[in-house]
Amino acid sequence: MDDGDLGNNHHNFLGGAGNRLSAESLPLIDTRLLSQSELRALSQCSSLSPSSSASLAASAGGDDDLTPKIDRSVFNESAGSRKQTFLRLRLARHPQPPEEPPSPQRQRDDSSREEQTQVASLLRSLFNVDSNQSKEEEDEGEEELEDNEGQIHYNSYVYQRPNLDSIQNVLIQGTSGNKIKRKRGRPRKIRNPSEENEVLDLTGEASTYVFVDKTSSNLGMVSRVGSSGISLDSNSVKRKRGRPPKNKEEIMNLEKRDSAIVNISAFDKEELVVNLENREGTIVDLSALASVSEDPYEEELRRITVGLKTKEEILGFLEQLNGEWVNIGKKKKVVNACDYGGYLPRGWRLMLYIKRKGSNLLLACRRYISPDGQQFETCKEVSTYLRSLLESPSKNQHYYLQSDNKTLGQQPVIANESLLGNSDSMDSETMQYLESGRTSSEVFEEAKAVENGNEADRVKTSLMQKDDNADFLNGVEDNDDDMKKRDGNMENLATLSNSEMTKSLPTTTNELQQYFSSQINRVQ
């Protein structure tokens, strides 16, 4: 572009309207060479006068932008394109008149005034404020509100010292009247028992103490005692639906009984005295007891329940017996074994239950319970258990001390010979072994002493020791006459036992081994 063209362009740029840009000079401007500030200044220039622009806007219907004209032959119009093309016409935005600021002298609504009046009356009734004084204070407050509008004063609600009687009445009404129906599900939890009391302080003097009763008879009972002595008791928590409540005292008794029966660790087995005497005062034959296959108490139980056929009748009879129930269902009961026969030693118990045998119902024994709480199903298990107690040295010592309190040399009588077997049918060796209550090691030592010829001295010494133990337990003091008399008796007994032992025991080692093996097999 030469200098002449630049001059013409400059003339066209400034021509016409002086400082205004003419429309003819727009095609001659290269906008690629203009900066951002120059483009902004160019956009602000216009050759139209204000009057012509106003007339153009009026002819367009007051719109800033004219409605575009679309050639229907070229442009395929559709509903979507029509919405995009003629979506919204930018109308002239007329400035809204400025809003007046809210006047500070606006009065309160009647509804809010009435609500505040109700709140004030409730507060007065709660704190027992004098009505005349409150009315005067309220009137003064309204006058101050009219003088200084826009400010809120609460002079009419000045805190007064509350009356204790009114507070307690409100608390009683709140606890008794506000009963909301709870949803179904897990019952409400009882408060932590460690929180023994809770204090509700309103003024420093009005206090309500909450005590939780921890006794089994009043579970879940919460009592509230105020400072004036008014007791507010709430009922226990709503129980869950289902089976009826259990008797707490009965459950506690059954738990104590179960702990006494099952808990074996509570007894010191080393200090237990093995008692083999039954209710008749005789010693129980353990070998005969081990050979019993059926329940020895079955005949006696059948005799006392003659005529009882239904389950209800047998349960009624079982309830009348002296004993303790095993469970809450009251289907099994523990009774003393001595009340129904002398087959077991004193202190043993029976667990009775209803047994179905064919189409008949019978009262039978299910378990044999020892004094230390162990349970056995058969008499053979009972015999094995008693033998295990007798095998230890401490048990043998207790057993001999207890049996030797009676007259020395008295032979124990076999209990229940009709059921457990006749003692006459037993051989002399078995009877001597059972009656003596000695172990195989003691018998072997006696046999060796017989061979060496020292049996008389040994038997005399053992008998004197037993007699001393018996006198010590009975509290008998030693006298000279008694000592001489006892020495004579000991010599006679030693001579007698020496002759009997010599006749009964074998003399050779092979015979001794055969004798001991046969005795062990017979016991097992």
Swiss-Prot record:
Residues 106-116 have a biased composition (Basic and acidic residues). Keywords: DNA-binding, Nucleus, Transcription, Transcription regulation. Coiled coil: none annotated. Residues 136-149 have a biased composition (Acidic residues). One of its GO terms (molecular function) is methyl-CpG binding. Residues 45-151 are annotated as: Disordered. Residues 334-406 form the MBD domain. The keyword Cell membrane does not apply. Disruption phenotype: In strain cv. C24, delayed flowering time during both long and short days associated with a down-regulation of the major promoters of flowering FT and SOC1. In strain cv. Columbia, no delayed phenotype. This is Methyl-CpG-binding domain-containing protein 8.
